[in-house]
């Protein structure tokens, strides 16, 4: 049975108040832009969002923050969003900061059905407070728990009608593990082809992890920090 939905608006209806939402992407790279816009427009609220970051003030997950749809954020980097800062300091937003490697492994573990694992990352810091500690080989480790979500949203370069996904270069980032960790996973793809057209050796995420696919072919490609080099002797950026 095909998994292609008619639009991101149809997909957004699968997300409900109070859901835990896992979002792929890294900064603004590889984020499911159209799905995020549709979630904003739908107005669902009290979300717990799990992502590497929370976008910027006017793009990405920052749009959901600005609309006050996020109750809790589980992330590893939040420094690019002034709205995030204001909501956190005013007590509107609950925040759980997780080291980036630990966050990736918590999502991967959740998707693999692993309830928890031990890591040395964060031992002796506030990150480890209140968590179980154990010693292995003379070194202290802290217990971290796997993360799963009610819905995961990811961005793919290509998808087929059965939900098999190919990501492109650095836009792969958190997307493959996010796709594994949702009870329902929705993939926004730049191109959708018929089942069997993708080379099996090129598939990054098998369709077994993906329940729905939507086409998102015309996204705005934003850059968080643009750095250019002056052309030698001309004073012009290149």
Swiss-Prot record:
It catalyses: a 3-oxo acid + succinyl-CoA = a 3-oxoacyl-CoA + succinate. Keywords: Transferase. CoA binds at residues 24-30. GO terms for molecular function: succinyl-CoA:3-oxo-acid CoA-transferase activity. InterPro entries: 3-oxoacid_CoA-transf_A (IPR012792), CoA_trans_fam_I (IPR004165), CoA_transf_BS (IPR004163), NagB/RpiA_transferase-like (IPR037171). Pfam families: CoA_trans. Signal peptide: none annotated. Its EC number is 2.8.3.5. Belongs to the 3-oxoacid CoA-transferase subunit A family. Heterodimer of a subunit A and a subunit B. This is Probable succinyl-CoA:3-ketoacid coenzyme A transferase subunit A. It comes from Bacillus subtilis (strain 168). The lineage of its organism: Bacteria, Bacillati, Bacillota, Bacilli, Bacillales.
